[in-house]
Structure formats: structure tokens, C-alpha cells
UniProtKB/Swiss-Prot annotation:
Maturation-removed propeptide residues: 25-45
Official protein name in the record: Alpha-conotoxin-like Cp20.2
Assembly notes: Hetero-, homo- or pseudo-homodimer (identical sequence, different post-translational modifications).
Organism ancestry: Eukaryota, Metazoa, Spiralia, Lophotrochozoa, Mollusca
One MF term in the entry's GO annotations: toxin activity
UniProt family annotation: Belongs to the conotoxin D superfamily.
Domain comment, as recorded: The cysteine framework is XX (C-CC-C-CC-C-C-C-C). Displays a mini-granulin fold, a structure composed of two short, stacked beta-hairpins connected by two parallel disulfide bonds. This newly described fold is derived from the same cysteine connectivity as knottins (ICK fold). The name 'mini-granulin fold' comes from the structural homology with the N-terminal region of the human granulin.
Keywords from the named record: Acetylcholine receptor inhibiting toxin, Disulfide bond, Ion channel impairing toxin, Neurotoxin, Postsynaptic neurotoxin, Secreted, Signal, Toxin
Function: Alpha-conotoxins act on postsynaptic membranes, they bind to the nicotinic acetylcholine receptors (nAChR) and thus inhibit them. Through its two C-terminal domains, this homodimeric protein would bind to two nAChR allosteric sites, located outside the nAChR C-loop of the principal binding face and at the adjacent binding interface in a clockwise direction. This toxin specifically blocks mammalian neuronal nAChR of the alpha-7/CHRNA7, alpha-3-beta-2/CHRNA3-CHRNB2 and alpha-4-beta-2/CHRNA4-CHRNB2 subtypes.
Amino acid sequence: MPKLAVVLLVLLILPLSYFDAAGGQAVQWDRRGNGLARYLQRGDRDVRECQVDTPGSSWGKCCMTRMCGTMCCSRSVCTCVYHWRRGHGCSCPG
């Protein structure tokens, strides 16, 4: 089997439904139901600590720290500030 066919087959078999960006998890809908709800039910994740940027949707980002715009700050103690011409960003002490 040619290498290109193998690569395409692998990409079809292993869809990337989860990815990690800026310290948070983005989860999209899959055929089995609400992907965000399923993500929160795995392991010891506490739904109460999750800040979702798209409430009521089956796609969203879950921040276990502080949310700033559409991104998650690296720590809970960070604050969200607006930088002129650069937009919102996290300001973390120390």
C-alpha cells in the first residue's frame, strides 16, 4: 500500500476530536452525543470549576483556571486585562 494511502487511512481512523490550546481543553461534538459533557465526566474533573465559553452548545472550551476572552489563563490567580491594540490577555502575579 502506498505511503499516502496509509497516511490517509490513519487520519480517517484517528480523528482529532480533542486538542489542548493555551492551557485549556477544546472539545467538539461527536456522533455519540455532547463531547463537552463527556469530557467533564472523565476522571476527577469538577464541572463546577469549569468555565465554558459557549454555554448551551455541544462545542466549547473548558477552563479549569480563569477564562479571559476565548482563552484559559495559566493559573487561577491570574486576572484578565485589556492591552491596547493587542486585545485581552492574562496578567499573572510573580
